[in-house]
Amino acid sequence: QPKNEVIVELADGWFNPAPLKLFGKYNLRETLTIGEPQVIADIYMKFADREMIIGSDADWQYCEGAYTFNNIYLGERLDMKLFRGDNTTDLLMPDWKNVVLSNGPEGRLVSSFIPKINHTLSLGAEHIHVVDEETFIIDFGAIITGFIDLSITASENQRVELLYSEDVDENYELNTDSTLAGFVGKQVTEGVIIDGGIGAPARAEQKDAFECRSGKNHFINAFTCHSFRYVQLSGINIEQLNNVQALSVHTVLRENGGFYCSDPYINKLFEVAKRTKLNNIHSVFGDCARERFAYGGDIVALARSQVYQFDSAAIYKKTIFDFINDIRPCGGVTETAPFMGIKTNGVGGETGPLGWQLVLPYLIAIHYRHYGNVNLLAESLPFLEKQILSLEMRDFDDLVTCCLGDWGSRVHDMRNYKNGSPALHFTSACFYYYHLLIIAKICDDLGFKEKWLKYIGKANKIREKILSLYKNTDGSFADRSQTSFVFAIYFDLCDDIESSLNALIDLIKKEQNVITCGIFGQSFAYEIFHRYGHNELILEWLRVEAGFKKMLKNDASTLKEFFGDNLNGSNNHAMFSSYSSWLFQALGGITVAEEAVGADVILISPSFTDTINFVDCWHQTIRGRIECRWRRYKKGIELVIKVPFNLKKCTLKLPKVYQLNKQLPAPIDCDTYHHFYDITDAGEIKVLL
């Protein structure tokens, strides 16, 4: 009878991290659940006449493997001489010993329910730069997060080292600053170099290494994802290289939205947002390779754009659970989930800043709007109520200091890293107001009228406080920055919306069409400028040389962390990719309405901007596919819309300037500039405007 073996190869991962001090102070071993690599397994076997389960127990054995080192940030080291072929578990001389039983970590073991991480794209070498006889640099043409797949011919004991980078300098030398784990080894300001602690490398670069056997050697990462466009190989000459590819690896999320228009640059922006997002999704919404943490603030800023581009039902649910699982004893939500020690300007008790704590109620609300899971809504409410109680423990004047504000703003005061965001206290107060508005709506959605009255009452009191403290005599707010105007308009705090919009537009024009807001302000700006019909301004912003075009110079295919020089930023960071929601909602015209439950209320409101000649847009909801396509012809604009028949409500919003000549039924409503048409049961319509 054939013999069957099951071999599990273990790595350190997040469970056995190196004692590396990220940013010079955060040691993951002090905050995460840690231990020696271990396994729990049940093997299910089904025969013709019976079923059998074999579980991991004291009869299992272990041995040392072929990997001599692995770390999620720093890389892998492998000895090719210890195994046969390409199978690192097919060891030549395994020394099997009885396993040691462990109680394992605390908590409840839950089966994974999200899409898995997989290889989705392969890139070949676009250029090879030879440094010397035993060193060369490969350019793959685009930044990916993933693995190297390398085949070489080598001699016995030949050592090959790989160094990864997102960038090169003017001398074509690798510039690894943007991927140094936790800035370790980077000079962040003059005379200040981040120290990673005892045993840490001088520079926490992304590196792999392997010892060769004589003949063919095949190396492919197993335990470390790198963020890179360039890789430097040392220890071999170029003639020994047989094949090399960069493999993009990420959680495989199904695309549920597409966008294409007449402007190739706008199409590139759409693809860049998609690629940068995926590069940083590995079971959690990570920020960049330097940290790989799920920051609540980043998730909030990108939540709308994410849900239009990808099927996010499962991974949003997991993210909600992740933040709930790490709620602190006081009821507050952490800055990242899992919590790993960072709590910059937090509310206290290891909790995160106000805007970052918004991730829990905001994601729950977005999930309900798009996916309609009422059970998730009900199960989450007690945690949201405890969160509100934890926020109420702080005096209002103290609470509004507990945030990082509109992070990433161009007008951030770099001399005051933690408190330099524009209109900091005002935006913090708005975040608190938003917490209360969201929980009130959730209570209303669940039919809890008394709780709705309670929280909407609290929200109204905070609104009055905001108006009394931060409203200026001229109707503006706080420091009169772009951020302050955007927040005031988004949260409907202005007496005269039109006047405030014009003042904001004037500020943007004075900056040569540059929107200086940070990640929250930009996300909100895309919403308000579409809502109030100023979409041409957003196109001007997206096209301005000092904005995304500068980010994408030198054939860049991913977004950077910051605008400007990006001195201390990543070159593979998605936090400013929220514009993709505007492409869907404004140019593409497809919006899942605020009052929707499981995407059952849809607004079709395309913006026929003068500089765009056609748009093809689609979005797959849980109720079916929605399409909105429009094209300019000499005789007018042809608009084609397809909607499923199972919607509660679908409204078409069109400017009054267009004559429909009875192509649609009479409008059901109108405002100053638009007619509104009920197309709930239309299925497919085609009109000429």
Show the residue positions of the predicted features.
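Helix-terminus loop motifs that line ligand-binding clefts
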Residues: Y172-A200, A313-M414, A546-G564
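Amphipathic, well-ordered alpha-helical segments in soluble domains
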Residues: D298, T319, W356-L363, H435-I438, ...
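C-terminal capping/lid segments that line or modulate ligand- or cofactor-binding pockets
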Residues: R77-D79, R84-G85, E291, G296, ...
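Non-catalytic C-terminal accessory modules of carbohydrate-active enzymes
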Residues: R29-M45, M52-T88, S111-I117, L121, ...
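Extracellular/oxidizing-compartment recognition motifs
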Residues: Q1-C288, G297, A314-T319, T334-G348, ...
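Active-site acid/base region of carbohydrate-active enzymes
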Residues: L28, Q240-E271, K277, V284-T336, ...
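Alpha-helical support elements that line or immediately flank enzyme active sites
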Residues: F147-E166, F223, S234, G297-D326, ...
